[in-house]
């Protein structure tokens, strides 16, 4: 009797619920993302016969091959030795970091910022997620310009929002000549038509990943005025703010009081100090009430950000301002691009000359890959650029990112011949990459 009861109870328990109760967002989308596919391909390629004995050169994901500046490392080491700095910080950020950010940005915004204008976050991505979570109700729409940083999409959708895509139109003859970021343009009439009664926000990224475009004052003014007209919040992703190679860098929040009141600006210590693993970012706004919603969401997402690294960033910002570090970094990156793009000039492969960021898009239309080249099934189901990337990893030992991942399926043809390379590497590493890419001559 007892055994029969146990058997019946067990059967009841095993059939009343599924084995795993998971969020449908993650169970319905089982396809591997570009980062997983590229990293797995690189790991396998490292062991193939052609790459044995030579280093795989990874210019794919935007992580640095070198350490943060010595002054930042010293500040992190000092912070770890202070007992209370290893405990929770205030949810909106350590006062020391907030004060350093006020010191950094007040001259830029031409006003004396206050603590209520700043929220520290656990990286810029969490800052964007906090902005969206603080703003969106189910069904609200967010306009995203295409191509986009892929993390924007799940951030919006996990907050119950709907993504509306507006293209950044590529220049003509992209496959025939070198172009500039300024030649990639937004049709602002199309942008305004995309706004509906459900539109809550727009995300603008400048300098832009992956294009390398720095939006002009005129473009941002047009965008900002349309947002003011329709009361649309602007989330300005400015994580590459110190990496612009144009004469100036325009921040949309500074263009008018009305635009500033609708803008949330996101920044990153990881990008500023070659320390992407530190996971320290921030959100700024001249509208303290608007920012407060992002701050409340941040509190619920992670409560507080890493205290020792906040302290390190606070002091590193002060150090950087004293020694002109950010300008020096800009000049270093101008040289890095000069080193790296020289091979494409030599080979005659067109690219979009970056106006900012540490990325460059290169057109591989002229590269002749054997038609019978073997690809894994998961690559065959992707865009042409995934096949080019897979071939480049396996044959030349160079890793790049296929940028159709930054487009929706219907529009990915615009990038099917492109690859994105990251130059956030030391100069010797880039020189090795150039030597390796010279092997492309055999395929032109």
From Swiss-Prot:
Coiled coil in keyword set: no
Swiss-Prot/TrEMBL catalytic activity: L-kynurenine + 2-oxoglutarate = kynurenate + L-glutamate + H2O
Gene name tied to this protein: BNA3
Range of residues in the leader sequence: none
GO molecular function annotation: 2-aminoadipate transaminase activity; kynurenine-oxoglutarate transaminase activity; pyridoxal phosphate binding
Subunit structure: Homodimer.
Cofactor(s) named in the record: pyridoxal 5'-phosphate
Subcellular location: Cytoplasm; Mitochondrion
A biological-process GO annotation: kynurenic acid biosynthetic process
Biological role stated in the UniProt entry: Catalyzes the irreversible transamination of the L-tryptophan metabolite L-kynurenine to form kynurenic acid (KA).
Chief localization: cytoplasm
Pathway the protein takes part in: Amino-acid degradation; L-kynurenine degradation; kynurenate from L-kynurenine: step 1/2
Catalytic EC class: transferase
Species the sequence originates in: Saccharomyces cerevisiae (strain ATCC 204508 / S288c)
Miscellaneous comment: Present with 1600 molecules/cell in log phase SD medium.
Modified-residue entries (N6-(pyridoxal phosphate)lysine), positions: 271
Protein name: Probable kynurenine--oxoglutarate transaminase BNA3
